[in-house]
A protein has these predicted regions:
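Cofactor-binding loop segments of dinucleotide-utilizing enzymes, especially the Rossmann-like FAD-
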Residues: 1, 54, 78
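Conserved N-terminal catalytic core of the sugar/cofactor nucleotidyltransferase
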Residues: 1-47
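Phosphate- and divalent-cation-binding pockets in alpha/beta enzyme and binding domains
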Residues: 6-9, 61, 152, 176
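Conserved core of the sugar-phosphate nucleotidyltransferase
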Residues: 9, 59-139
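Short, well-ordered coil/turn elements that cap or connect secondary structure elements
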Residues: 15-17, 46, 68, 92, ...
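Conserved beta-strand segments of alpha/beta enzyme cores
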Residues: 19-21, 96, 163-165
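Short beta-strand-to-loop acidic/aromatic patch adjacent to the donor-nucleotide binding site
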Residues: 47-57
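Conserved alpha/beta core of the MobA/IspD/sugar-nucleotide pyrophosphorylase nucleotidyltransferase superfamily
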Residues: 114-180
Length: 180
């Protein structure tokens, strides 16, 4: 994607013994993140996945928070504040995500119920294989590649048994730097 060469040169192919693989989206300027993620669908089905958007800065404690949480399918979220923009979610009393609210469906009258997606997710191999990737393929086939991957999660929350939970932050710092 955008400035991908700079990123690869800066990070390299290994970090502290961890192998880093890159998936190139050559049409990043004509597609959205749903297409970039669809390019990685084989990798999503090989193992558990941490999905982290590249335009984030965040407190180091967020990684262990999500990695060591016992729930296999998790989204980090933060209680809505006025500076937040983008996809929101609504939760039930057990922190199950019951709806993803895209920017165009945002209602100021509902802000007391909104949590902003931090855009750090954990998906189990099973969730990716049986839920996310099949819906990702159907969604892109029906609606194209200029959409957001959260829209697929929105569809999944409509299932009778959605296995995606939220982990609300408790004051940990994060910010989307594309808004700076």
């Amino acid at each position: 994607g955008y400035k991908g060469d700079l990123l690869r040169n800066y990070i390299g192919h290994k970090y502290k013994g961890l192998k880093i693989e890159y998936i190139e989206n050559p049409v990043y300027d004509k597609t959205n993140n749903i297409y970039s993620l669809s390019l990685a669908k084989k990798e999503l089905q090989k193992d558990d996945t941490l999905l982290i958007e590249s335009d984030l800065i965040f407190d180091d404690t967020l990684f262990p928070m999500i990695v060591y949480n016992p729930y296999p399918n998790l989204a980090l979220v933060a209680k809505y504040e006025t500076w937040m923009d983008g996809t929101m979610v609504r939760l039930d009393e057990e922190n199950n995500i019951v709806n993803f609210i895209p920017k165009k469906a945002f209602k100021y009258g509902d802000v007391d119920y909104y949590y902003k997606t931090v855009n750090i997710y954990k998906f189990s191999k099973e969730f990716s294989t049986t839920n996310y990737v099949p819906f990702l393929e159907a969604y892109t086939k029906a609606l194209g590649n200029n959409e957001y991957y959260e829209q697929v999660l929105r569809v999944i929350t409509l299932l009778d048994k959605c296995e995606l939970k939220a982990l609300p932050l408790q004051g940990e710092k994060w910010y989307e730097i594309d808004d700076v």
